[in-house]
């Protein structure tokens, strides 16, 4: 049996998590849009580069982290400079800048 204050705490907790879900959904939509516009800009400038970038990003559909040499250096540097990927030179690995970016990659590609 719930006492009045316990019920209020449950309601407040549910509102807090609903707001958190809304915030996370908004952050995800924002990241998807940023990636989409980034890819659109690249495609307008250089379609060959766009195709190479899409091929590189497709490597992340199944894996969060990959070996850095799986992506050609020019593409790797371009994606790191544009804050799409993070390079860990000590491990020789690449991964998306965040889980939001990773999920945006998986959604768009």
From Swiss-Prot:
InterPro entries given in the database record: MJ1010-like_2nd, WH-like_DNA-bd_sf
Top-level taxon: Archaea
Protein name: Putative uncharacterized protein MJ0819
Family statement: Belongs to the archaeal ATPase family.
Gene3D superfamilies (alphabetical): Winged helix-like DNA-binding domain superfamily/Winged helix DNA-binding domain (1.10.10.10)
